């Protein structure tokens, strides 16, 4: 392996880790193994701390491929709680409002999900990395500032209802770059004349890379010790 020439690695991001923390950990392990102070490492698509699943990490010259990987379609398994919302649209923030769910049926959910397939407009969450006047939306939102984000055009290829167990539903989503599953949860809740927030999210695929192709971050150091590493000459 030659981490300077470039390697592409697949990880299952642990729960509560930021994407940045995963990159830092991998960079630290590689730098230590190679005995170098600097090695270029980056990820090809952020996952929220409360999400797990496929994260592609590129090293060295392979970081030039990050954009290519970002444009691959992604598949998620999402768990939504209906009848309640949070400011972050997930469990990062406490429930701020509750709504009725008595009128919701399985058929209603299935019909509603169909409306989200295809090209749609989605307003990103205020608690997101989108920029507003050069500042990250989540920095403004956490300070309590009003954040107004413009809708983005994106594509949902597939949505499938996997489990229906009110107030919880589980869905599989195949979508394009830039889709916020948290925002999709918000919109599904509204379309059901209720509310919803995300209680669990797993990214199961990025392009052809599946969850079963990924290694655990905690196993990386031991895995690295088993590899034949080419010496880096600056």
What are these regions, as identified by a protein language model?
Residues 1-234:
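Catalytic/RNA-binding core of pseudouridine synthases
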């Amino acid at each position: 392996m030659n981490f300077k020439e470039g390697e592409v690695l697949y990880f299952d991001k642990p729960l509560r880790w930021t994407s940045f923390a995963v990159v830092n950990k991998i960079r630290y392990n590689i730098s230590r193994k190679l005995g170098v102070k600097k090695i270029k490492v980056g990820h090809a698509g952020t996952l929220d701390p409360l999400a797990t699943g496929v994260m592609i990490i590129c090293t060295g010259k392979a970081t030039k491929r990050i954009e290519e990987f970002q444009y691959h379609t992604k598949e998620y398994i999402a768990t939504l709680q209906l009848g309640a919302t949070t400011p972050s649209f997930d469990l990062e923030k406490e429930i701020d409002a509750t709504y009725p769910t008595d009128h919701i049926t399985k058929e209603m959910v299935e019909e509603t999900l169909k409306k989200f397939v295809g090209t749609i407009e989605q307003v990103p969450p205020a608690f997101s990395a989108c920029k507003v006047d050069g500042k990250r939306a989540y920095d403004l939102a956490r300070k309590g500032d009003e954040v107004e984000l413009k809708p983005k055009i994106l594509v949902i290829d597939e949505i499938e209802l996997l489990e229906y167990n009110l107030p919880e539903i589980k869905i599989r989503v195949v979508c394009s770059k830039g889709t916020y599953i948290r925002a999709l949860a918000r919109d599904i809740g509204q379309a059901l004349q209720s509310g919803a927030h995300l209680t669990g999210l797993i990214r199961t695929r990025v392009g052809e890379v599946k969850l079963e192709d990924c290694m655990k971050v905690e196993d990386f150091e031991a895995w690295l010790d088993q590899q034949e590493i080419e010496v880096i000459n600056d």
